[in-house]
Amino acid sequence: MYNLRNQILLGVLTLCCASTSASGIHDSRHASTSGSETILHAWTWSFDTIAANMHDIAAAGYTYVQTSPAQACYIGDGGGTALYSTPEDSVKGKWYYYYQPTDWTIGNYMLGNRNSFKAMCDSAYKYGVRILVDVLPNHTAIDHHAVLPTLDAAVGGHENLYHANGFNEITDYNNRYQCTTGQMGGLPDVNTENPDFQYYYLQYVNDLINLGARGFRYDTAKHIGLPSDPLDAKSTCNDFWDIATGRKAVKGLSLLMPDSLYIYGEILQDRNTKETEYAEYVDQTASSYGQVLRQALANGNAKDIDLSQWYHPVNAQHLVTWVESHDTYCNEHISAALTNDQIRMGWVIIAARATGRPLFYSRPEGSSTTNIWGTNRIGARGNDKFRHPEVVAVNIFRKDMAGQPETITTTDDGTVVQVARGNRGIALVNISGKSHKFKMPTTLPDGTYTDAVHGKNFKVYKGILSGKVDFLTSYLLTAE
């Protein structure tokens, strides 16, 4: 208890002050599976902004920083830097333009150039943080005529860049042919099985690695075909994932240092997602668990909700977990109604767990439930909730408890969630909007415990934990 509390105080005080070719078969899903990793999604932060805040990121206990897409992208709204503008706004822009590639080279007008990317990676290395880059080989910009000539030339002409079915809109996302070859939301589908494209794209990925990237998040991963999926008329083999994870070379080129990378895919769960087959190549997102957790947070209790299950067929060791993602916040705003305090309670639950690799989505600076875009600027740092003392505390707790088993229980009314890690420590989370006294069984030995953040005392007697919890507050208790 003393060590944890002092580590947290040190972290908070610190915050306030301030190439080998692939061969054979590789498992690039997890460079480390110690159960101590955490990811900060520095959403729309520029490379310079991430570098400038790397000290604070490391002090807050994160082991990875995930950037937004780094490749050349569509220049919309005159190159404006608003996260999301309306016709009345003087500064225009849309955050999603960087999800519309025009070439696969490093640097874009929204986040920074190649030199800024390198400086960010150098800063991360200095502080022992690893850089994950959001990559998206599945599609190009809606305006496909904006694709740069260098990309067209690299793939043998514009007509060879896309699947034969690549301009037909998906109408059934559970139809694997449509899902993996068709146009999604107006975004034309790239022929990811074209060896010329694979070679060009892999050059981009290897360039990122040479500059210091140590992992990748594959956007729209379930829209890129698996070996068992139907072939597009222009394709002879669905081998993209073999190449992207270093199992196979293309035109003599292989993924660099595949055994040292962490790779996961955005594979949103549905009726025909093929999670177990994707798991042969990449880790994946536990989107259903996030939905269940948000429901408990919205309810203010987890009664009749099982938070111990992951709602996923893949071992939780290979899942990226979240309370919310940039999609749940920005697209249909399905998580935007949750307050920062509610999101933090969810974070403590997933970060205290033994498995999964939790990702903390950084909301925009100045945002609220009534103003989701906040100060509304691309490139700026998000709000400071990523380094809240309770967040720092559970990030440290996660590292200290690595290897310990977990048990998740709730009070009878479901308002207090306990994540126990063996008999060494617990995270106690009041997800309700009321302060109240409680009693519940625990794995902690009998004794009096002082919370590491707030200094509040709790008592364990004959295996029963008791005390008073404040509304939307978390506590961390550890045995001596």
Briefly describe each language-model feature range.
Residues S23-T38, A52-A58, Y62, P69-A70, ...:
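Active-site-proximal helices and loops of the catalytic beta/alpha 8
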Residues Y2-L9:
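Bacterial N-terminal signal peptides that target proteins for export
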Residues W45, D56-A60, H144:
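Active-site-proximal N-terminal segment of extracellular/periplasmic enzymes that hydrolyze or transfer
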Residues T33-E37, C73-A119, G157-N191:
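Aromatic- and acidic-residue-enriched carbohydrate-binding clefts of CAZyme catalytic domains
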Residues A146-L148:
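Eukaryotic low-complexity intrinsically disordered regions
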Residues I39-D48, L187-Y199:
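Active-site mouth loops of central-metabolism enzymes
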Residues L10-C17:
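Bacterial N-terminal signal peptides
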